[in-house]
């Protein structure tokens, strides 16, 4: 999770920031079931954490006939899977690119997507239309907190579409500059403003901080 020390180290003393809690993550209890013959999809760090918290045990040994391929969105999600001791067969920067890759290259596989209740429905809409077996399993819930921000800031940075929806409930996007961690989050921001949004590459935190350092002066 991003903290003030990370921001200070990356941006230097010329920047100051506050953190506003816009969402709360609650893991759901899901009884583990057999994953045999399924490929697994993770589109967030929270999905990975909730998956393993529920005791699921994927089989990544490709020598086994029914091993599980793992697909994911974002470098942070890949890193979290590594933390649990699992590699990734294919990494894409957003759900749209992952859906396109699956349609073009993996149409005969069966997929289970472990995600939150507010996950975008890109995969759910696209894969079944191509006769690709897809199942969504909600393993965590995202609660929108709808904060009211009284202080005036020069810029704002968003890290998820749900964070955007929570923030705009009681706040205007009347900032000099708006930053976003990736294209999916940027698409959500543009539903509420026509101002330019500075978008980081590949949903990568370091890339976003570098963008803020360059454009936020």
Cite the ranges covered by each PLM segment.
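Signature of uroporphyrinogen-III synthase
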Residues: 1-217
